[in-house]
């Protein structure tokens, strides 16, 4: 990412570079996981995508980061004068410890500010979610997907797909 940011900082038409490069991908859905920074790479990605999903860990930094991302996306879109089509599809609560007071407080704060964007499916912290990266596997590969973590992410993916279809049909998701 650092090398890409450095290269992009010296490139003309840098906001459309990723769009040009990625337009040849023949898939209906492409997931791009970016670092929570606001460099050239993030701006390029925002120019390419239709939707942004904001993952939020239920702690102070997660809530603060969500607020910053929401503000940044709005400000970037405004600065691009209609050229950026990205919109926030939703906010996904991840790695939550739902019985803790802090997680409950953060969830309440998210509901208060962005209730219409919160996904209903919450990803609770689990051993499998912690262990999968250590074995260089995603949650669906780890233990052949037979984990609570994989089931939670599967339900979240279904909710995301339902919301995308609803948005494309011009209506709110009732999922």
Segments predicted by a language model, with ranges:
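Conserved catalytic-core segment of NTP-binding enzymes
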Residues: 24-120
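Short, flexible helix/strand-to-coil boundary loops that buttress conserved ligand/catalytic motifs
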Residues: 5-6, 42, 133
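Conserved NTP-handling cores and scaffolds of large molecular machines
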Residues: 16-17, 73, 77, 164
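Flexible, glycine- and charge-enriched loops at secondary-structure boundaries
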Residues: 8-12, 59-62, 146
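C-terminal lobe/tail of nucleotide-utilizing enzymes
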Residues: 78-175
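Cytosolic-facing regulatory segments adjacent to core modules
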Residues: 1-38
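Charged catalytic carboxylate motif
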Residues: 17, 68, 152-155
């Amino acid at each position: 990412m650092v090398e890409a940011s450095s290269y992009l900082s010296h490139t003309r038409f840098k906001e459309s570079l990723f769009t040009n490069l990625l337009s040849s991908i023949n898939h209906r859905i492409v997931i791009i996981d970016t670092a929570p920074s606001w460099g050239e790479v993030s701006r390029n990605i925002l120019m390419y995508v239709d939707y942004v999903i904001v993952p939020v860990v239920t702690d102070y930094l997660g809530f603060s980061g969500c607020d910053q991302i929401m503000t940044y996306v709005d400000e970037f879109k405004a600065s691009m004068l209609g050229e950026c089509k990205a919109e926030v599809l939703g906010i996904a609560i991840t790695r939550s410890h739902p019985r803790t007071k802090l997680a409950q407080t953060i969830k309440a704060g998210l509901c208060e500010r962005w209730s219409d964007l919160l996904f209903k499916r919450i990803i609770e912290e689990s051993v499998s979610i912690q262990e999968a990266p250590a074995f260089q596997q995603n949650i669906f590969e780890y233990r052949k997907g037979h984990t609570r973590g994989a089931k939670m992410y599967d339900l979240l993916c279904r909710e995301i797909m339902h919301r995308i279809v609803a948005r494309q049909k011009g209506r709110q998701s009732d999922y």
